Amino acid sequence: MRLAGTAVGVGLAAGLVLTTPAAPASARPSDPGVVNYAVMGKGSVGNIVGAPMRFEWTYTDPFQSYYVDNPVCNNWADIGLPEVYADPDLASFNGAVAQESPTDMTHFVKQAVGVYATNDAAGRAFHRVVDRTIGCSGQTTAMHLDNLTTQVWTFTGEPATATDATWVKQEAGTDRRCFTTTRLRENVLLQAKVCQAGNGGPAVNALAGAMQNTLGQ
């Protein structure tokens, strides 16, 4: 009986060893070339937001095409900004804008991805978003665009985590809102923004997840 008990015990122990999941592999830095894949095309974007996106354009350098009356909200007003991404250690960058047509922005989506030479450099970029926008949540400010139009937006957001920041801006007098997420993943800073009437939160999370899945980490 003692032998049988020993055998059962060994069998149980072996079973436990076989069914214990392996520890997850550590993430590794992304190669600069991932920016060519991390930005989703208009077809994929349309599937995510549930609307036909017939027009898109891409950009390969960070840019800013506006100024805001309240500077603390500058880095929440848009994504892909030089103030955020510009750094001597920025190895590669890519971004895209998609909308329903050249003149129809009922659904408007913007993406930005930057790969840095080091994780620390990417972390600095992330903090140029979160540190410089402290106090923006709850604020309303005018946004003056380069095309000489002015929009007024109210910003709301939760405190950022060590790797993620999300916020919403709503245009004054409308139900139009832009849902934005910023994610720090190893040596990559990625951002996604979905603007539409109603709740674009699920769509922006799905878009950022699709972008993140291409990073090869």
Question: What would you call each of these model-derived segments?
Answer:
Residues 193-217:
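Surface-exposed amphipathic alpha-helical segments
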Residues 109-112, 183-196:
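Short, well-ordered beta-strand elements
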Residues 94-101, 177-185:
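Short, surface-exposed beta-strand/loop micro-motifs that present aromatic residues
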Residues 95-127:
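A short acidic-to-branched-hydrophobic micro-motif
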Residues 54-56, 60-64, 131-176:
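Short Gly/Thr-rich strand-loop-strand
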Residues 1-27:
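Secretory targeting and sorting signals
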Residues 26-98:
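N-terminal "mature-domain start" segment
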Residues 107-110, 174-180:
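Short, surface-exposed coil-to-beta transition loops
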